[in-house]
């Protein structure tokens, strides 16, 4: 390294000395050489990259250009006769990466960091970087725009994406997987206060009214609780636990769902409910529904397991029922009849 630096200094010294010793000359055929510039109709030596012209050639004294090395934070990248070196660009922004550092022969270059694209290009890299579009769950990166932003496309049959990302593409569906678990709970309320619902989420998820609490626990599968919806549609209050349609479950394990319907009364007796519908066949799963006490409301639980990786959309449907089927036209509380609140959730498949 020292020998290289010494050679470079010696080279510059030679230029400075030669600049003094070699006199400017008249153009040949009206032109100067590539490493020269024309001043007062004389061809004078240019300074090489990394230096500047601290003194121009002088026809009166018959002396050539004097070149001086650039200082720290400055540069010249080509032959020149500039009166001073150029200042390097400042440090890169937080959303940029430095692809070339500042030295005496090159400017600093900043490019956009991963996850960003260039909105405004300059002669030395990008001047303004902005965040790339992030593809949501069920969508993957399929290309880029002319400016470098991400193009998102829905994952096709046999592919999936379960991330929110500006880099991930749709991936092939792993073998032995299914991807949709829908748990719908229909409540036929019997009093005004039972129209009100509260929810909790997590591994143990619950829906509560003034009369009962329904809790769902799950193991070896992931029926994610989305923004559930509560509505009075045809005088039926409906709540639901839903998965996203592109969340894949490993069917090498048995998906286990355990429900408890606990009535808010003094009756502590419990019993296991019997399935009213059972279409087992396409994937392993296990369910139990325990009723504690005796509720007045009618409760229907529907569980739908779907394999959306097949063209015909194979499904297993499990259902349970507890309570008396009410004459809702005669017994529906007045407040339930006018209470309508629907949030962003997937529509039910059963109503």
UniProtKB/Swiss-Prot annotation:
Entry's localization field: Secreted
Disulfide bridge positions per record: 32-43, 44-57, 47-67, 70-85, 88-102, 92-110
Chief location of this protein within or outside the cell: secreted
Question: Which parts are the TNFR-Cys repeats?
Answer: 31-67, 69-110
Q: Which CDD domains match?
A: TNFRSF_viral
Signal peptide region: 1-19
Q: What induces it?
A: Expressed in the early phase of the viral replicative cycle.
Residue positions with a glycan: 103, 191, 250
Would the keyword Repeat turn up in this protein's UniProt record?
yes
This protein's source sits in the domain of life called Viruses
Q: What exactly does this protein do?
A: Inhibits host immune defense by binding to host TNF and various chemokines in the extracellular space. Binds host CC chemokines (beta chemokines) and CXC chemokines (alpha chemokines).
Family stated for the protein in its record:
Belongs to the orthopoxvirus OPG002 family.
Write down what this protein is called: Soluble TNF receptor II
Q: Which organism is it from?
A: Cowpox virus (strain GRI-90 / Grishak)
Phylogenetic placement of the source organism: Viruses, Varidnaviria, Bamfordvirae, Nucleocytoviricota, Pokkesviricetes
Record gene name: OPG002
